[in-house]
Amino acid sequence: MPINWSTSALLLVFAGACGKPDAAPATGQRPEVRDSTPSRPQPTRGETGARGLKRAPDSAAKGRGVKPPPDSAILIQLATQPKLRTKADSISLVSSIRTGLRNPGWPVKTPSLLPGSMLPAKRIVAFYGNPLSKKMGILGELPPDQMLGKFDSVVAQWRSADPSTPVQPALHLIVSVAQRLPGKDGMYRQRSDPGLIEKVYGWARSKGAITILDIQAGKSTIDSELPRLIPFLSRPDVHLGLDPEFYMHHNREGRIPATKIGAMDARDVNYAIDQLAALVTKYHLPPKVLIVHRFTTNMLQHASEIKLDPRVQVVINMDGWGQPWYKFDTYARCEAAEPVEYTGFKLFFHNDTRKGDPILSPREVLALRPRPMYIQYQ
């Protein structure tokens, strides 16, 4: 039932300031299948409590951040946040905000921004999926005209919610789609035809949007999948996404995508950063944006070793689905607790509303700290 969020927030933060450190989250999980290919865990409330958050490892923040704000600053910011829906949601949001505000790794000390850098001057708002599948995201769920009309509406909502930060629209296309079957080459992924990429790129251009090409590599590798995208990534308005959930390496060998959550190491991400940075230099492009999805800590290993390069702006995107409390907990544990550079937040039109919760509004997402600079709708 609805509660007065501001009053509860103040009480919870005072209690948190005097209480014990947060406990590590429990490990119990139950599977969810979001398509014939992808699956992911969705803990129950008892398995990961709202206070069940990991503190940021020293290595994650060392040398990257500044002194955390005093509790008084946290209280001031929390008192201005919107009302939420349930006590559980409010507890989790307060805990998530506190995690971000108290982590000395935020804000990350990034290299000096180059001309044309998109972040943090703009916030990217993206529709995600593949036009060949109605189950993988909004990009393929509706006919193009309807999808783009809804896209315009969502972008307008974000512009209204935060007028101080311009919105950069984006279409986020999965171009290597993980599969449960091996395929002819045994790599358990299907590559999109270049013609499909051009089609989505054309849709994006018609809306003044950028295009993000996403890799679900399966048993293939980033250094096998990325080179074929170079002709597209050489364009100034095309960027890259990596999905560790379907990267079956780093002790996932022998497992089929969607039967076990995959993982990437910082080395995999750094390879992509190097390739994108080289394109920026070679073709005199504005800096690229690299989106890396994450909803468990193990999905992205050695995150503190991801390099910072002014030619590539890295976003760690929270892409867990579920009720608001679960999404806030996941954001705290996987994004706010381990600073890399920028953060993102994913919203699911269907999976987030399965239990009757309305999808989180822009204003609710903007309550998080650090504020996500990339917003993705599936």
What positions do the PLM features span?
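Sec-dependent signal peptide recognition
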Residues: 2-10
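Chitinase-like catalytic core of GlcNAc-active glycosidases
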Residues: 164-209, 219-235, 239-244, 248-249, ...
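Aromatic-lined carbohydrate-recognition surfaces of secreted/lumenal glycan-active proteins
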Residues: 217-222, 281-299
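C-terminal motif of bacterial Sec signal peptides marking the signal peptidase cleavage site
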Residues: 15-17
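Alpha/beta catalytic barrel-like cores
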Residues: 19-191, 304, 308-314, 325-378
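Active-site-proximal loop/turn and secondary-structure-junction residues that shape catalytic pockets
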Residues: 131-133, 175-177, 217-219, 244-248, ...
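Loop/turn elements at helix/coil->beta-strand transitions in domains of secreted/extracellular proteins
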Residues: 166-167, 205-210, 236-239, 284-289, ...
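Extended amphipathic alpha-helical segments with heptad-repeat/coiled-coil character used for oligomerization
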Residues: 249-263, 317-319
